[in-house]
Amino acid sequence: MILDLDIGNTLSKWRLKDVASSEIRSRGAVWTREEWRPGADIPDLDVVEAVRISSVARASVLRDTVALLRRQVGAVHVARSTPEALGVSCGYEEPARLGVDRWMGVLAGYQLTGGCCSVDCGSAITMDFVLPGGRHLGGYIIPGLRLMKESLKLGTRNVAIDPDSEADELLAPGRNTVEAVNHGIYMSAVSAVNRIYSEVCDREGVALPLLLTGGDARVVSRGLRVPHAIWPDMVYAGLETCFPMTAAERAGRLSGAPPPPPAPPLEKVRASLAFSMLL
């Protein structure tokens, strides 16, 4: 089995993948901790022959995690943000400072669609752009839905946005304080994603396929004007591209990859942008 770890600052996700069949056998999520408990926080390591890690947690968390795993697993691979990988050149002035989860999303997206805009809807909403030739432009970071709400210090009125709500409902004026806050936060997030996407595509002269991942991808998706696809395993797919271990991975078949979404006509993107600038 392959154990894939996506370690965040507060929440970490894992999955077990069968080497022979490439099937995902199990998956889960736990709070990030200094000391993992195999068999409790993560699967029993007796069945694991290799580990792949993407981590944006503190350096001490990654160091201690790797030390624990290497005592029991033969191969432990840690992803790093690099100046270039798999045909993509990093747009950051200091590539090592780009969050490795974002880099994994960029690499996975590029393998799937060529140029793309990858959006991770987590605690923060990050947007990264890579052109068809492999040049990563850099990206944007804005507060996610939860962080925006926490900044308002609502206390007991801090009711989460219902992920099953329809976009028309979430974009309508709120009829009480909780709705007004939730709808305002949602409007802010989706408006930012729509506007940033249009601005960058207009400036670069190319409309890019749009890929979403992260815990809030499904609800953010409902408010986007651009054709797109949701790819929950996009960070894991980045690990697969960097450290291919199964026959399917070596053949370029990435876990859970959606059909590549069509890019909208550039003229339509520009028309939408021009209209929004008149408002």
Swiss-Prot record:
Q: Which residues bind ATP?
A: D6, I7, G8, N9, T10, L11, S12, K13, S123
Q: Which domain of life is it from?
A: Bacteria
InterPro entries from the UniProt entry: ATPase_NBD, Type_III_PanK
Catalytic activity, as annotated: (R)-pantothenate + ATP = (R)-4'-phosphopantothenate + ADP + H(+)
Q: Report keywords, A-Z.
A: ATP-binding, Coenzyme A biosynthesis, Cytoplasm, Kinase, Metal-binding, Nucleotide-binding, Potassium, Transferase
Q: Which cofactor(s) are needed, names only?
A: NH4(+); K(+)
Purpose: Catalyzes the phosphorylation of pantothenate (Pan), the first step in CoA biosynthesis.
Which PANTHER family does this entry report, sorted A to Z?
A: TYPE III PANTOTHENATE KINASE
Q: What is this protein called?
A: Type III pantothenate kinase
Query: What species is this protein from?
Result: Chromohalobacter salexigens (strain ATCC BAA-138 / DSM 3043 / CIP 106854 / NCIMB 13768 / 1H11)
